[in-house]
Structures are given as C-alpha cells and as structure tokens.
Amino acid sequence: MASLLDRYLRNISDKSQQNLASVAYLASLDHLLHAFPSIGQSIVQELKSQRSRLKMIASENFSSLSVQLAMGNLLTDKYCEGSPFKRFYSCCENVDAIEWECAETAKELFGAESAFVQPHSGADANLLAIMSIITQKIQSPAVQRLGYKTINDLPEQEYEALKAEMAQHKCLGPSLNSGGHLTHGTVRMNIMSKLMHCLPYEVNLDTELFDYDEIAKIAKEHKPTVLIAGYSSYSRRLNFATLKQIAEDCGAVLWVDMAHFAGLVAGGVFVGEENPMPYADIVTTTTHKTLRGPRGGLVLAKKEYANTLNKACPLMMGGPLPHVIAAKAIALKEAMTINFRKYAHKVVENARTLAEVFQRNGLRLLTGGTDNHMLIIDLTSLGVPGRIAEDMLTSVGIAVNRNTIPSDASGQWKTSGIRLGTPALTTLGMGSAEMEEVANIIVKVLRNITVRSNAESGSSKSEGELSEGIAQEARQRVADLLGRFPLYPEIDLETLV
C-alpha cells in the first residue's frame, strides 16, 4: 500500500501547490504507522476524531502544523536547567538562543517588562507566580531582617518559624463557582491553598458579575498579600485599573491569570483598562487556548520579579522542555500577525452571535451574555444536568463541557450548566452564519433531551435520551458544517486508513 506521503504527492502533482508542513507531518505519520503501528493509529484516530466534532470546549483550540512540527525534534533530548546563558549544564547555546528569542517575542507581543517561558502548563505558571511572590515579598525581606544572606543560612528553628509565617499571609481570589480556577487557592485539595491562607471573593448572585466594591471591602478587611484576578468560566471582561487600585489600597500584589483570554490581549481585543499588562505585577497564561500554541505556560512580570523567576530552578522547576519552548516561540510569532488580530476579534464576534441565538430561543446565559470567547448556559429551567447535556451533545458531534454556576445545587460532577467557546471553530474559519447554525443545533438538542433517573443507583446516575430522529438530524448538520470547514484541509483524511 502506498504511503500517506506518496498519495499526497500523487494527488498534488504541481510542486508549487504542495505544503511543506503537510509533507513533513505525513512523513512522520508514515514512519510511526510503520514502526509503531498502535501509536500511529491512535494519532490518526485522534485526528479523525477532532475532525468529526465541533470543538466548543472554551479551553481548546487548534495549533498550526508549524507549532506541532517544532515539538518533534532532537531538542527534546537536551537538558538545560537554569535560564538562558546561566545553565547548570554545558553546550546549551542553541537552546539559549531559542529560549531568549521566545522570551523577547513574548515581551514584545504583550508589552511585558520580563517574560519567563519555561512553565510546562498554566498550573505550573500559577505555582511559580505564587512562589515568586512569596519569595520576593515575604521570604527575602524576612531573611534580610533576621540578618542572613540567604534562606539556606537560617538555623532550623528560625526557618520553621518563617515557614509558619509565610503560610499565614493571605491570598484573595475568585471562587470556583464564580468562575475562578482550581489554582486560585480557594479549593483546598489544590496545593495553592496550602501555601497561603486563601480567601474567596464571589460574583454578585443577582447580576452574576464581579462586584468591585465588595472585593475592595473584603480586601480592606483581610489585607491580603496577593490579589488574584482572572477566570476560567466567566463571560465578561475585567477592569484591571480598578483591581489595581484595590490591590494598592490594601498593599497587595496584583496577579492576573489570563490563561483564557491571552489571545484576546495579544490580538488587540482587550485594550485600555481591560488589558492587564499595564496594571498587574505578575501575569500568567497558558500558550494554548486563545493563543493557539502548544500546551504550556508563561509568566510575564514587572522587572522586580525577573531575577526570582529566572531562578525557577531550583525554586520549583527542574529541566525545561526546549522543544515545547521552540513551539511557543512560533505560536507567539504567529500571534503578532494581522491575521491573528482579525482572528481574535472574530472569536468574540462569534461568541456574541451564539449568545444572541441562544437568548432568542429562550435559553438563559450567565451574566446575560458574553464579552469574550465563552458563554455559560444555565440549564436549570430545562431540568437537564450539565453532565447529561455534555453527553448528549457529544453524541451528536459537539464537544462542550459541563460547568458549575454560582450557588450550584447540583455539585461539581453533575453541574447545572455547560460552558461553550468559539476559539477552535473560529480557527476553522467559521463566522456568524455558521454560529447561527451551531446555536440552533444545540438549542434543538437541549430542548429534546429526556432525563431518566436510575431508581437503583439514585438521581446522580440519571441518564439522558435523545430520539434517533433528532440525533440523526443533528449529526448530519454537524457533518455538513465540518465538511465545509475541515481541520487541516491540506491533509486528505481519505488517505488516513
């Protein structure tokens, strides 16, 4: 049987029309299918799977083939603990060049004073941010006050006392039910809650918006060392000038987690007081989601934190992933183009179109709409748990995720809502007309779900049903959309057996 690459080249005989990234990608698949068939087939099946669903999980996107190819090379074999030009290993000059370029690109793209590009994930970036703040604002002053040069010089008793003191400092962040993230410290199972005394702030239950006066009141009462702003399920923008003032009034460091909306900052959608960069002391982000890069994280900060961040090893990190840093650099360069700016604006336009259609059809959205890339549907009036809505939409080829809503009585497993996002569909080239169609499909599915409880195991094991007619119609409409907007159209899936 001819290889995937052979068939691709045969179908596109005009060399000027051949895509080098596709050639490289197909060649790598050919090798894996031959040398490690089970792994190769799983990759092919995942490609087929992602091509056969409308990806509407707000935290997911599609990276370019260039980004993917940058991760598949011998850079993965290089150990390079430390920071550029200050490594614990020799022969790192090429990795130094890549990491330096990546950091400089990040600084230029976001207008940051410093950039640390090594974190393996958003969670790692957040952990590094809080550890850097603790080191800079609590540990170092205490060590100096005690008359020592470094923390390693402290006698055991004084070291233990300092650790106890650090754990008493307060961190104020958004609760999980109000749209915050696990790593914002308000979930006790997460390590962040064990590093400081973490306190939550909530959205107003009537408006479902963050109440800055209430946040200021809590901050004034508790005087946190750190004020966290950001979200993973909140459909509006934040005013970072106001949040900065709240932080300054109580003497707190302002840390912004922009993992979800970094691409909207890079693309010039969030500007002025909606752009965290001029106001935050430290900003963390993932490089996937709206940035369309590889899975990874970044920490952007004021200059005073640069030295601490560059000592992430040994603070909390070991060896970085230079092959992923190379891919981050490519994604950041892609985000500096005019096409990316157009993309970022289209992401929000598409989300607003979805919201309009949902509301026109009687569905309730948290906060009454969206100003960013996501929206959350409150399913309470439909009597459909988020878990079942997720399952039923998945069954017709639409990937969303269940999501809690403020004061959610259903808990974090069942939930009373679902979260949807437009980054991936916008990457495929879909626009307002397609969003109308997608929203109408979702409305029809949600309104035709029948929930049946399992009497033996209780309501938590209830299941959803959808008539075959409704399901088949939805699948066909989804297939029609995906047929017009295929993932990686330069790769012919018919050749992927």
Swiss-Prot record:
Keyword set, alphabetical order: Amino-acid biosynthesis, Cytoplasm, One-carbon metabolism, Pyridoxal phosphate, Transferase
GO cellular component: cytoplasm; cytosol
Residue stretches spanning the membrane: none
Broad class of the protein's primary localization: cytoplasm
Family matches, as InterPro entries: PyrdxlP-dep_Trfase, PyrdxlP-dep_Trfase_major, PyrdxlP-dep_Trfase_small, Ser_HO-MeTrfase, Ser_HO-MeTrfase-like, Ser_HO-MeTrfase_PLP_BS, SHMT-like_dom
GO molecular function terms listed in the Swiss-Prot or TrEMBL record: glycine hydroxymethyltransferase activity; pyridoxal phosphate binding
Pathway stated in the Swiss-Prot or TrEMBL entry: One-carbon metabolism; tetrahydrofolate interconversion; Amino-acid biosynthesis; glycine biosynthesis; glycine from L-serine: step 1/1
Keyword Cytoplasm: yes
Binding annotation for (6S)-5,6,7,8-tetrahydrofolate: 176, 180-182
Entry EC no(s): 2.1.2.1
In-chain residues carrying the UniProt-annotated modification N6-(pyridoxal phosphate)lysine: 289
Obligatory cofactor(s): pyridoxal 5'-phosphate
Keyword field contains Ligase: no
Enzyme class per UniProt: transferase
Reactions performed catalytically: (6R)-5,10-methylene-5,6,7,8-tetrahydrofolate + glycine + H2O = (6S)-5,6,7,8-tetrahydrofolate + L-serine
Localization terms from the record: Cytoplasm
Record GO biological process: glycine biosynthetic process from serine; tetrahydrofolate interconversion; tetrahydrofolate metabolic process
Feature type site, description Plays an important role in substrate specificity: 288
Function noted in UniProt: Catalyzes the reversible interconversion of serine and glycine with tetrahydrofolate (THF) serving as the one-carbon carrier. This reaction serves as the major source of one-carbon groups required for the biosynthesis of purines, thymidylate, methionine, and other important biomolecules. Also exhibits THF-independent aldolase activity toward beta-hydroxyamino acids, producing glycine and aldehydes, via a retro-aldol mechanism.
Assembly and oligomerization: Homodimer.
Matches recorded under HAMAP family: SHMT (MF_00051)
Family (UniProt): Belongs to the SHMT family.
Protein name: Serine hydroxymethyltransferase
Name of the gene: glyA
